[in-house]
């Protein structure tokens, strides 16, 4: 005999059956049992493994792990990208298709960067998520149409705040580093305006933020922001924003 194996979204199929017959009263699941003898639910995917698979499949290695980037002290970009992506995706419960689209977009960004560019891997992934979920606010962020307090209040509407917190006192999450990159680059975009932003106060015994943010460890965030200023040497996000918006020429084939 012939055995048919069906891969379906049962909930959507039940909705389609009800729509076809024009009634919400139909027991669609019982109707399907006429045709389906055995059901098997696929296990939830291992997000960390899937992110690593997409990293290899779209050949991120060719760019992020190039000899020139390693010589320029950028060897941590791979780890930052994978850790941040994994933290966000686990918290957001994205579908596999959504995850793939995020990685494709991220790889396209890298294709328009040279090996000498700072690519802010954690921030880039976060900005692509913001652009996907709320494109209007994304435009406000990159066009300096928000105050710092408005940006602080907007972040929890996109990302679960637990991704920014680590119980360990010795380290921070990749997402917190991405948040620090966001505030750093946001401040850099105001650098040549009449109202430049100062994010930290280093005159005290411990670094302190000059703004109020309740959902992260303020000392860790202040230290991460100071780390951004030291590491990126006042570089901004101009090139990355153009690459995210697909306005820069492609320099590399995927």
Regions found by a protein language model. Name each.
Residues 47-48, 55, 63-254:
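The feature marks long, low-complexity, polar/acidic/proline-rich intrinsically disordered regions embedded
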